[in-house]
From Swiss-Prot:
Membrane-related topology note: Single-pass membrane protein
Gene Ontology MF terms: protein transmembrane transporter activity
Annotated protein name in UniProt: Sec-independent protein translocase protein TatB
Family in the record: Belongs to the TatB family.
Amino acid sequence: MIDFGFDKIALIGAVALIVIGPERLPKVARTVGHLMGKAQRYVADVKAEVNRSIELEELKKMKTDFEDAARNVEQSVSSEVNRTSSEMNQAWESLSSSDGNGGSSGSAAADSYHAGEPLSEPPPAYTHPRKNWRLKRGAMPQWYKQRHGVRAKAQSGAARVARFRPPRPL
């Protein structure tokens, strides 16, 4: 902000003491201090806002660059796929035209495929093994259950108290 040296501050203080007077000088100095603090906070907020806007502009620029690069990659991939598919279609057309002319350029499996005949039996349909899910649930070893105190039988609190209550003296 404004740079004041010691001599300038002393001169301003002496003039303020003469003009304002010793009774109101502390109150005025406190008010000036508050106003200076507010001004410094305002300047800091403006700086932060400017920095944020600059960073936002940089991020927007990076976003557009990234989108352009992605668009270029997409275009190159799609053109390559189109070129490859056209080459494959041309090769397929040349093969089908040579097969249609009576030439035997394919194997017996290809001929049977074009004729619609299956090459072999279809695989058998999947059947579920129908395992007992309760066995899978109880797969925890006994030693683990005993060590960690896993209850084998559920009991209510009252039944547990009755079970472990010492017998009554006769």
